[in-house]
Amino acid sequence: MGLRKKSTKNPPVLSQEFILQNHADIVSCVGMFFLLGLVFEGTAEASIVFLTLQHSVAVPAAEEQATGSKSLYYYGVKDLATVFFYMLVAIIIHATIQEYVLDKINKRMQFTKAKQNKFNESGQFSVFYFFSCIWGTFILISENCLSDPTLIWKARPHSMMTFQMKFFYISQLAYWFHAFPELYFQKTKKQDIPRQLVYIGLHLFHITGAYLLYLNHLGLLLLVLHYFVELLSHMCGLFYFSDEKYQKGISLWAIVFILGRLVTLIVSVLTVGFHLAGSQNRNPDALTGNVNVLAAKIAVLSSSCTIQAYVTWNLITLWLQRWVEDSNIQASCMKKKRSRSSKKRTENGVGVETSNRVDCPPKRKEKSS
């Protein structure tokens, strides 16, 4: 993500520079319209669709819990409105972190323009990954997925989600959708846009797939693992930008990165390949949320394997490029050292007769008569 330059001059209203400088305020005004809609009876029902989770069903509470009923959720068309509103919230939070945290650090550290772009990108992702890891781990613990791992492939009831599970997925979709307008707001370079689009698209594809196929617990576990590895990656980048002596941390991150991909593959294969295949139903129907069909299993497993192979290949190519660049830099440094040593030898009189050598006595000036 690029760094916005704030000029002291006020740009014309509705100009491109005006929108870039004040996009957070503009988005806040749009969000306020939905909040003000709650005040009036005629628009309250429409505003609630954007602000709260939709498609809920009341089910009886368990016997060991308190009497009454609890609400479970499924997905539907109205979720698009909720995702849109929280996408606006993500844009506002993004601008707040950029202005009040990252921009102040940039001024203190006095980074170059290239480092500013990398620092801003790593800073934004670090905050998001850190918050998502804590939130996702809390959901896994509260829904007993760690104490009962079978819940990873068994949702009860099959096509329903709890409030916190659905809100987590809505928030994730909103964040990654907000990354598209941020490419414009942050003045991303044209050569970086394809890489960013692939990165955003892969996250949206897998999060949406887990959400629509009701693989909520499996998707949540894989997201936590993935976000943890990415968090270490961007944290190492932040330390490296602040001081290049932390370059060894990047090598440590590469090991954790490979291990994280292996764990993700193992969990995916065990869950999708064995457990879903072992509980084959006679009349599966993916439209009702039952993903225990051959096409869905092959799609989920192949998608997980493909993305892990793609990301790992990118890491290998990146390290090969760095290795080639480092070797070229070392070769150029050796040439410079050799040229400097040869110059010193010539200056010291090695192979050349000169009176400026150290071991030669200085010439005495002849007195004029």
Swiss-Prot record:
Membrane topology term: Multi-pass membrane protein
Any one biological process term the GO annotation gives: protein insertion into ER membrane
InterPro entries: TLC-dom (IPR006634), Translocation_assoc_membrane (IPR016447)
Stretches the record annotates as Disordered: 335-369
Intervals, Cytoplasmic compartment: 1-29, 103-121, 186-196, 243-249, 319-369
Signal sequence interval, chain numbering: none
The entry's keywords: Endoplasmic reticulum, Membrane, Protein transport, Translocation, Transmembrane, Transmembrane helix, Transport
Lumenal side: 51-81, 143-164, 216-219, 271-297
Pfam families associated with the record: TRAM_LAG1_CLN8 (PF03798)
Subcellular location: Endoplasmic reticulum membrane
The keyword Nucleus is assigned to this record: no
Biased composition (Basic and acidic residues): 360-369
TLC domain span: 117-326
Entry's transmembrane regions: 30-50, 82-102, 122-142, 165-185, 197-215, 220-242, 250-270, 298-318
Keyword Nucleus: no
Chain's role: Stimulatory or required for the translocation of secretory proteins across the ER membrane.
Listed name of the protein: Translocating chain-associated membrane protein 1-like 1
Organism listed in the record: Homo sapiens (Human)
Taxonomic placement: Eukaryota, Metazoa, Chordata, Craniata, Vertebrata
